[in-house]
Amino acid sequence: MYAIVRAGAKQQKVAVGDVIEIDQVETAAGEKVTLPVVLVVDGETVTSDAKKLDKASVTAEVLGGTKGPKIVIQKYKNKTGYKKRQGHRQKYTQVKVTDISL
């Protein structure tokens, strides 16, 4: 059995026991998080009906926070002396999927 869950602006395929990275969630390590379900596949049965998915839930345990790779942004305008350098590092939360229920 696996499910497609929405975490932030992304959708990810998860099964019980998977460790995934989602956009940062303000919860402490060890707490439980419920992720919204988009689709559930159980063997040959595919559930995508909105009424049935309202009852479905994916529970995950927060393992901790991580950071993504450093991204460097550079801007340059010729002949004007304009230069700009900026960096960004996205924060993620690692979670372990503990239960998928319909």
From Swiss-Prot:
**Entry's family note:** Belongs to the bacterial ribosomal protein bL21 family.
Molecular function (Gene Ontology), one example: rRNA binding
Transmembrane spans: none
The record ties this protein, via Pfam families, to:
Ribosomal_L21p
Its GO CC terms are: cytoplasm; ribonucleoprotein complex; ribosome
PROSITE patterns linked to this entry: RIBOSOMAL_L21 (PS01169)
Q: What is this protein called?
A: Large ribosomal subunit protein bL21
State the Gene Ontology BP annotations: translation
Quaternary organization:
Part of the 50S ribosomal subunit. Contacts protein L20.
* Upper lineage: Bacteria, Bacillati, Actinomycetota, Actinomycetes, Propionibacteriales
User: What keywords does the record list, in alphabetical order?
Assistant: Ribonucleoprotein, Ribosomal protein, RNA-binding, rRNA-binding
- What function does this protein fulfil? This protein binds to 23S rRNA in the presence of protein L20.
* HAMAP family membership: Ribosomal_bL21 (MF_01363)
Is Zinc tagged as a keyword? Answer: no
| SUPFAM superfamilies to which the protein is assigned, alphabetical | L21p-like
